[in-house]
């Protein structure tokens, strides 16, 4: 499964059928993703999502998801986020200039953009939330 926790009945079905599930809390963190409601790259994207509530709710959301789903045998992995910097690539870091790995249309390092090191800082914080509730899975 991806992007958000699913209904409990789906995990029960996966338990019975022997499916393996990666339980994922969210697909965006601090910044919105483009939501193409008319098709990929068609029309004007929407940016509605959970990013507005990220800082206030993410630790509780992660903890609640793990507590709710930890007894399901189908779950083999907790996911704290999926493509959290995609497709908008809001973060930047000086290493991008020298490595020439940033997307060409953005032109390398953007000093006014949020530091890419934030991704690791947030990930460590959310991983700690998971481990506080369940140490049996990665």
Region roles according to the model:
Residues 1-138:
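Active-site mouth of glycoside hydrolases
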